């Protein structure tokens, strides 16, 4: 009817006015972030999407890896950031785009550092430690690494959320691990010290999408910046 046509014309007119004023509709970008990824890493990976000339409206969802992959397969997300690749066994058509890798650093508050005995990594033996939850890819590597070096720290707490683990670490409750690419930021932000590093412990980061060839402008910006900046150090 006439009413629908008038409304449609009104919409078109509003759209053309918006475009003429340079107020084009922002690009929607829906991203899922696995809760095992450090918040600072997630920020550095996602930030380039907001630095594009085009206006972007980003929606971030944090959750467990399998739940996010399910959302991706239903096209409810454009991208999933994770520290593990999606497996073919899952039966979901998704593609892994490697962003980079980082070794791990061991950090603690200066007050705790003063109490540690011996050089790294021997100083970890019997020392209070905060670790990632059992489902984390880094946790499995860490358990193996500690066994290999015959080290038995005193486990004070296990955390799915790295930000919460860092908060306890900052207060001197235990030694904690963090990706080495964040050392400068973590030490400055939390007032903690690096007591040692390991390149045997590696955290990998992936952008997972339903596209084999990346076409979403935000995903293109993220993958480019990760390789050129964050993981180029």
Model-derived features: where do they sit?
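Alpha-helical "hinge/linker" immediately C-terminal to small N-terminal DNA-binding modules
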Residues: 1-22
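Central regulatory/effector-binding core of bacterial HTH transcription factors
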Residues: 26-88
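Short, well-ordered beta-strand segments
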Residues: 28-32, 80, 130, 176, ...
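A late-sequence structural motif
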Residues: 41, 114-115, 193-233
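Hydrophobic hinge/microswitch elements
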Residues: 64-68, 73-76, 83, 135-193
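Secondary-structure junction motif
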Residues: 83, 114-117, 127-149, 215-223, ...
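Flexible hinge/capping segments at coil-to-helix
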Residues: 93-134
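Short beta-strand->loop
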Residues: 94-105, 180, 188-202
């Amino acid at each position: 009817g006439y009413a629908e046509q008038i409304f449609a014309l009104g919409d078109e007119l509003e759209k053309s006015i918006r475009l003429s004023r340079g107020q084009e509709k922002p690009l929607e970008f829906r991203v899922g972030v696995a809760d095992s990824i450090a918040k600072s890493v997630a920020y550095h990976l996602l930030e380039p999407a907001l630095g594009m000339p085009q206006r972007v409206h980003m929606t971030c969802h944090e959750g467990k890896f399998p739940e996010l992959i399910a959302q991706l397969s239903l096209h409810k997300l454009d991208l999933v950031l994770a520290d593990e690749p999606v497996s073919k066994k899952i039966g979901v058509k998704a593609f892994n785009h490697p962003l980079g890798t980082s070794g791990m650093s061991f950090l603690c508050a200066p007050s705790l550092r003063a109490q540690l005995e011996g050089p790294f990594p021997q100083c970890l033996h019997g020392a209070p430690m905060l670790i990632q939850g059992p489902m984390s890819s880094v946790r499995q590597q860490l358990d193996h690494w500690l066994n290999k070096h015959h080290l038995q720290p005193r486990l004070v707490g296990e955390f799915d959320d790295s930000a919460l683990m860092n908060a306890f670490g900052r207060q001197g409750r235990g030694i904690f691990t963090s990706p080495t690419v964040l050392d400068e930021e973590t030490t400055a932000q939390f007032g903690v010290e690096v007591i040692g590093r390991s390149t045997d412990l590696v955290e990998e980061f992936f952008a997972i999408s339903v596209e084999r060839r990346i076409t979403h402008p935000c995903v293109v910006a993220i993958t480019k910046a990760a390789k050129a900046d964050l993981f180029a150090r």
